[in-house]
Amino acid sequence: MYTFRQLYRFPELALGTLLALITCSPLIFAQTPTIPTPAEPKIAIVLNSAEASVSLIDMQTRKVIKTTPVGKEPHHLMLTPDQKTLLIANAAGNDVQLMNPVNGELLGKIPEIIDPYQIGYSPNHKWFIANGNRLDRVDIYAADGANLKLAKSIKLAKTPSHIAYTSDSKTAFITLQDSSELAAIDLATQTVIWKMPTGNTPAGLWMTPGDQYLLVGITGEDNVQVIDWKNRKEVKRIFTGKGAHNFRPLGDKKHVFLSNRVAATISLLNMQTLEKEGDITGLPSGPDDMEITPDGKTMWVTFRFAKKVGVIDIPSMKLIATIPVGKSPHGVFFTPRAAWE
């Protein structure tokens, strides 16, 4: 019998079990050579979290052109503030891989980032957080350009998952998936200032424009919880589909997509009306992370249960292609891309 944490990190291990559970020292980045960002994205980078590898996909031919070994359990990724280096969080490898975001070339590692399941810079780029999903800890680093210095390691149970920030970079929010809570951290003091209960197994987080509401994907249920975080209360639930998980904004400051891992759908939400506007259906199982081309017309999606990546035509809300990749594909990235707003 798998533990819940194993199922969460690698949900395709036992899909039937997952369905049952759901329903009932300073660090310095390596110097990166400057490669101009193309006018259009050329290569999609996909993390195969159960294979310790990265698939590089030619976005024109939609074929895997290279599979590169990386550290154990690569789950999430993000750009450095100067946009020259892609950071890949190798959770079980206890390090962060450095990669050229344009061509997928490996550039080295940052060691001793312990259990980095999810990572993220604050909007002002002065703070960097690594969530230790397995070890129940949140590590907060002071960031000065490419330099990181551990400010504080906070024990935070149970199972810190995703991250969001206020636009002024004063507060970070962390979902605690196994205690079904949302935690707020004051970044100046690196202290937990409050917790509040959420629905079962919260995961993805997204802050609406103007820092008005915090959207929480309730993966153990079928909805997005809308939180008035200033008053620590629920405003409403937006019902989307079972396994409501992660967010990707369209880039128009109005709409955000949400992946529903168990329902195998993606919902389009209006952040102004707090209503669902539609669903993308007919998808392979386990839609998870998403990325959008800079013209806002095409979305790439990882399907964790199906070992595939999908390409979706946004105007028609239809799946137009799938590409086989490795086991448990999670993070996906390319540059340039639509704005995260």
Regions found by a protein language model. Give the residues of each.
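Predominantly soluble domains enriched in secretory-pathway, periplasmic, or organellar proteins
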Residues: I22, P26-E341
